[in-house]
Amino acid sequence: MDIRAAEISAILKSQIANFGEEAAVSDVGQVLSVGDGIARIYGLDNVQAGEMLEFPKAGVKGMALNLERDNVGAVIFGQDQEIKEGDEVRRLGEIVDVPVGRGLLGRVVNPLGEPIDGKGPIQYTERRRVDVKAPGIIPRKSVHEPVQTGLKSIDTLIPVGRGQRELIIGDRQTGKTAVAIDTILNQKAVNAGKDESAKLYCVYVAIGQKRSTVAQIVKTLEEHGALEYTTVVVASASEPAPLQYLAPFAGCAMGEWFRDNGLHGLIIYDDLSKQAVAYRQMSLLLRRPPGREAYPGDVFYLHSRLLERAAKLNEDNGSGSLTALPIIETQANDVSAYIPTNVISITDGQIFLETDLFYQGIRPAVNVGISVSRVGSSAQIKAMKQVAGPIKGELAQYREMAAFAKFGSDLDASTQKMLARGERLTELLKQPQYAPLSVEEQVCVIYAGTRGYLDGIPTSSVRRFEAEFLARLHSQHADLLEGIRTKKALDKDLENTLKSALDSFSSTFA
């Protein structure tokens, strides 16, 4: 082997010339104190608010939140037991972001977008910051397309539109999550079709819930074939407060990808009360001044900047939409507490679920008297508007009369008729869990209720009437259901067909 001196000297010269070029510049700080998931750091002079930090020794990440004169207050996304005073902290030079796109559908992820379902890495081509500005006024359009929840009491009386924020509020164990899950399950039919503009992709954000509860929800979605168009973001009760705070923003970024690509997204925050509690915990540990109920002063802004990101965009911006269904848990039906009033004032309406109704067997336990949708009937198809108009008035009169009827025994015939009709309509609006109805089925059933076909049958037989009538429609009048689905209106021919179907069915019903 011959050694060429010229070659060796050339290599040495090039190495000396290029020496030190790849030396990475990193802004490094030191941990001053750590505890309760909060670290005080000295030395990160150029760090940005919301920037990701790394604690290399402990192998965990964090986020800078408090930028003070002589130190930085950071929250830790993980266990802080491994972090010691004097440990090195590095800036990562990026604001918290998550992967977005279709690759997340059918997956269960944590608030940093990392998979926790054991199905391998996530395929994505794009990442988005979790906390971005909401669309302005000019790119928006008024809400005019329906989100079909599959629940008669909501689709007829409190319609939700694409791009709307509709709050689901009630005490614990009143069926708030059940309403949200039914809404996801009901999208299976439209998502199975070819029309991308009709599809509704779902994001379910579980904040501060038990892992067993979340596992049950994921199992339900999987069994009903709904997980394939749904992303589940989980920050369970055992996760640190910063991750529970971050989860809704991460889910929102994933939902916004659909909105900004001309598609339709639906996001469920279950629930924002727990996010507010996590934010309160972080703020108090960071020594921010407390306000009402010890929440920080900007807890309203926390929820408003999140919910304002749900919007319906106009044609110039792709006509996409993101619909939000935030959930708030009340204590003893107290809607005048701080967080409930905040979120009620931000959203475009609310669905009140009541414990009393739930225990009376009225499920979903929607109080149709005080629930409201500020979008109203512009979020309904024409057929639903035609049949749902009378039911609102009749139920309102029934509630008023029922209160008076408690005191008087001798009621005139018209009052008795009104009470009987109201009872049957209330019974008609009941529905079992995980059994959403398509809009054409709802139109036919509500039509039967408001046109007096139920008046002659006992209240206890209303549910049986509905089930058997729908079975008859599917077996003998499939063209009627198809007509309502395609025309989205109840024209004279369809109405006559529906009337004759009801007449023949009610004459044989016993």
Swiss-Prot record:
Required for activity, annotated site positions: S371
Any one of the GO CC terms: plasma membrane
Main subcellular localisation: membrane
Localisation: Cell inner membrane
InterPro entries membership: ATP_synth_asu-like_sf (IPR023366), ATP_synth_asu_C (IPR000793), ATP_synth_asu_C_sf (IPR038376), ATP_synth_F1_a_nt-bd_dom (IPR033732), ATP_synth_F1_asu (IPR005294), ATPase_a/bsu_AS (IPR020003), ATPase_F1/V1/A1_a/bsu_N (IPR004100), ATPase_F1/V1/A1_a/bsu_N_sf (IPR036121)
EC number: 7.1.2.2
Group of enzyme by EC: translocase
Membrane topology: Peripheral membrane protein
Pfam family, one: ATP-synt_ab_C
Gene Ontology MF term list: ADP binding; ATP binding; proton-transporting ATP synthase activity, rotational mechanism
Record's keyword terms, sorted: ATP synthesis, ATP-binding, Cell inner membrane, Cell membrane, CF(1), Hydrogen ion transport, Ion transport, Membrane, Nucleotide-binding, Translocase, Transport
Signal peptide per UniProt: none
Catalysed reactions listed for this entry: ATP + H2O + 4 H(+)(in) = ADP + phosphate + 5 H(+)(out)
Binding of ATP, residues: G170, D171, R172, Q173, T174, G175, K176, T177
Family: Belongs to the ATPase alpha/beta chains family.
Self-association and partners: F-type ATPases have 2 components, CF(1) - the catalytic core - and CF(0) - the membrane proton channel. CF(1) has five subunits: alpha(3), beta(3), gamma(1), delta(1), epsilon(1). CF(0) has three main subunits: a(1), b(2) and c(9-12). The alpha and beta chains form an alternating ring which encloses part of the gamma chain. CF(1) is attached to CF(0) by a central stalk formed by the gamma and epsilon chains, while a peripheral stalk is formed by the delta and b chains.
Function: Produces ATP from ADP in the presence of a proton gradient across the membrane. The alpha chain is a regulatory subunit.
Cross-referenced HAMAP family: ATP_synth_alpha_bact
Protein's name according to its UniProt entry: ATP synthase subunit alpha
Source organism of the structure: Caulobacter vibrioides (strain NA1000 / CB15N)
